[in-house]
Amino acid sequence: MQDTAARVLSCETMAQDLVRIILSAPDIAAQAKAGQFIHILVPDSGHVLRRPISLMAADAAAGTLTLAIQPKGAGTQTLCACKPGETIRVLGPLGTGFDGKGAQCIYFVGGGVGVAPICCAMDAFATAESRAFFGFRTAAHAYGMTQAPCAVTAVSDDGSASARW
């Protein structure tokens, strides 16, 4: 576990009500496993507690962490307003992580912002036989399908994302 200053590489809208932040944090990326999370200190003096954020991806070779954050409250709204080049304090990796090594076929199931850690698990453990099933509020809220290493079926509450991607 490391407590480090991570540099924001990008911060952009990924889907409706969802922001993708890519951080440069080589020490954490080198240790991170699918299913783990980090604690982020909101970069202002008004927030004392760190925010737990699941890893959407951890690239040890590039030294990067990819996060999907829903800007709901003041803390996550501040995080989602970060600009490339800024630094934020990050503690991690935390949690036990997933263990899917050796599995022949895994069914991945997630919805909304909870798809982010599933994307990390798919990158680590998906096989040709694996399948993913995602649920979203609407098709505009959907993400995580275009680069999935296995077949993905996505559905939405309003029926606008009821197709195989």
Question: Predicted regions span which residues?
Answer:
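Ferredoxin-reductase
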Residues: 2-84
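FNR/FR-type flavoprotein reductase catalytic core
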Residues: 74-165
